Amino acid sequence: MNSLLQALHLLRCDLLSLPIGDAQTRSAELTALLRFGADLNIIKRRVVIEVKLCGSLLLNRVESVLRNIYGITPKLIRSTPRNDIGESCFLLRIDDPSLARKLGLIDTSLAPVRGLPNHLALASGSALKGLVRGAILASGVFTESTRKFAMEVYAPSNETALCLQGSINKLNVIAKIKEVRGSYKVVIRDIDNVAPLLRNVGARNSVEKIEQFIKLRHPENLGPRLPNFDDANLRRSAIAAASSVRRIERALQILKGDAPQHLLYAGQLRLNNTHASLEELGKLAEPAMTKDAIAGRIRRLLCLADKRAKTLGIPDTFS
């Protein structure tokens, strides 16, 4: 087993040794794990979930949540070959018609949701950390090139990747989306970003060892970085996005829900996906819309809030 796989094995053991947490946290972790790692099959209008779980610790964790929270006993179909880090893998079938709907994995027409269920997209606190932990356990890997170390989490769709990116950003960690031949993954580059994320989701025991391993292999990453045009552009974009988010937050405080629903929805969508571009934001909307349409709705929301603030004699969205 190479060093990267050893580091991944350490991380998985660390995460799986954590207490499962309260019901909301357990549900968030399970939902993300299934969204990022399971197949949903429709058989005679019944949703059957099949998921490959590697390692007996993960298998026991998932079975425990299914039994204790949802009263479901999944069926172990078969064992599959060991994965790259030597864990035994198991194919688990969950044949319960209500579970996918309870978790928000499907809509009313039995179609899989495009991104993440709404309750996960709005998650915070321990549920947010459970969401990210579940995604990492489902499809997270460590990678490295000549000069760069990264964690990558493979996503089933662009919309799902965008939602995970937003969730990671809520934990004050920079994540980006990369598309390779129609497949999407969320990438967290450099140990300086990866380590805080892993600590946030509970992997405190393994992070120090992973940091030491990376710094020994890539000492050139420890030196100061020279500023460049990309850094400057990123900073300008971040400042503009932060200003927009602050105005929208103030607008929602002023309006207190008294505004057209489609405008409120656009504002909340931006707050839930602070680092997404307008084009990406439009794709996340239900139904999807163009970047001009989503930008127009946000502008009208801000304009309406500023007019309301002037009428009430209170600070507007620029305050």
UniProtKB/Swiss-Prot annotation:
Which BP terms does GO give this entry?
cell division; regulation of sporulation
Molecular function via GO? DNA binding
What is this protein's name? Probable cell division protein WhiA
Q: List the disulfide bonds.
A: none
What is the role of this chain?
Answer: Involved in cell division and chromosome segregation.
Pfam families, sorted: HTH_WhiA, LAGLIDADG_WhiA, WhiA_N
Q: Which residues bind DNA?
A: 277-310
Which organism is this entry from?
A: Tropheryma whipplei (strain Twist) (Whipple's bacillus)
Q: Which residues form a coiled coil?
A: none
The family line of this record is: Belongs to the WhiA family.
Q: Which InterPro entries does the record match to this protein?
A: Homing_endonucl, Sporu_reg_WhiA_N_dom, Sporulation_regulator_WhiA, Sporulation_regulator_WhiA_C, WhiA_LAGLIDADG_dom
| Keywords, alphabetical | Cell cycle, Cell division, DNA-binding
